[in-house]
Amino acid sequence: MRYSSLGLIALILLCAPVAGQGKRLTKKDFPDISWQAAGKNGAVCAGGAEAVVAGRDALVKGGNAIDAAVATIFALSITDSERFCFGGEVPILVYDAKRDVVETICGLGTAPKLATREYFEKRKGSIPAKGVESAAVPAMVDGCLSALDRYGTITFADAVQPTLRILDRHEKKWHADLAVTIRRMIDAEKQSPSDRKRGLRLVADFFYRGPIARELDAWCSANGGLLRYTDLATHVTRIEEPTSADYRGYVVYKCGFWNQGPYLLQTLRLLEGFDLKKMGHNRPDTVHAMTEAMKLALADRDVYYADPLFVDVPGGALLSKQYADLRRPLIDMKKSSHARQPGDPRGMKAILDKPPVEGKGGDDSQDTTTCVVADKWGNVVAATPSGFNGVVAGKTGITLGTRLQSLNIWKGHPNCIEPGKRPRITLTPGLVFKDGKPVLAISVAGGDLQDQTALQVMLNVLDFGMSPAEAVTAPRFATKHHLGSFRQTPPELGSLVLYPEFAKATFEDLAARGHKISVPAKKGHLAEPSVIVIDRKTGELRAAGDPRAKRHAAAY
């Protein structure tokens, strides 16, 4: 097996557990990892540096993009544990080059059978943002196992070795317990040493229908949780067709309507009516048009998007060019909208007669991380792992997420909580194709700001010709003119947040149009993008993650 010099550095670092025992590693321990990288054999861009190394090493050892993504995701549950947990979720978009198909792995858990609207309405008045009651069925593990089974080449044991090396440093109290749990899962896989796929199924059975499921049931039952063994035992990871829309000769893929991703596609439909390149990057007209288009698409998201297995989502109409043509005239280029204006896709009307439901308070959340991977065979993965604010389930070491807070308790609303229902989540990876081949993969952390940032980074590349590094570091903007996706925070009508790097004249122009201007409050950045751009002519894979948001990249 041949290794690049960079790969050997990483392997030497990671194969010395004694030197790292008990030591919290920092970026200085990975001198070859930066926020941007380029190569022709493989590329990874994600959150924690050590997780990026895990993915890069999987590629160097001969694994494909799916193998590398899964290794990265498992490691992120430790390196980025304040944003993503082992009991969390991860929607994944995969381009399988051999089969020439894009598929969605819905790594999203459902509401437990005990999680009813009546329960939360009577006992809580809302779905809590924190604690064990808000835990959905843990879905990340089966999502990753399904990815390895369908597209991968490595075993579960191979995928989690970097994760175990991190856990064995015992930086946090629960690390030792989770390491034991993972090694028990490996022992289950070893019962099928010669059949990789059967071994993966044995791991899934051990977690969802075996000892771990029973331990999670016992702990949740004793500690006020709603999750039970039957919820885990009946969990299924769905493999679905993605949603998509064409845009100026490109095709953009997103997850289904259980996800906020399709609103980015709606926004693109609206923006096709504007010559953004001629209008100029981040010029007042461009920022205004993009913001107003997002407001319209977000209004539809808040009214119609939900689990299609439970409600009839008018997806085809929402993404149609006819509907976009009806809605586009609502954009007044001289004036910021201060009203939420959902449309009527079923009746093909520009504005819905019934006013939208307003929020009732709560807190915003940005507990998410990122992962994009591409390999030399043409496979590409975009994944958005998330899940935190939960609690560690006893000696399992597994932190449960709080994804139920993305549902509501409004009777009759499409996203109202029901047992077995998937929350309408913000986690929204994306792929972009040109002439039938992938040219861009993107993942963004940042709650409701994810697709606002994804839109800008994508258009920075597609319309304005930027490099990945330029695209993720260019000044950004965002609006909170929408219902919050976490505990339904009220909209901030007319709001527009601008990076301070925007020209003074741009601030003044947009304020004159009625936008309520502010600057970012959180460490100077809006959301946290990671992107890979694939040069179809040279085969170069160029990765970049926003350095302000501590994203990391590696390639070889």
Language model segments and positions:
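Internal maturation/activation junctions in enzymes
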Residues: 175, 213, 225, 273-386, ...
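Short loop/turn motifs at secondary-structure junctions and domain boundaries
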Residues: 235-236, 361-366, 422-423
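Noncatalytic scaffold domains of N-terminal-nucleophile
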Residues: 21-53, 57, 65-259, 319, ...
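Extended C-terminal subregions enriched in glycine
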Residues: 377, 421, 454, 463-524
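Extended C-terminal regions of large enzymes
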Residues: 254-257, 262, 432-449
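Bacterial N-terminal signal peptides
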Residues: 7-16
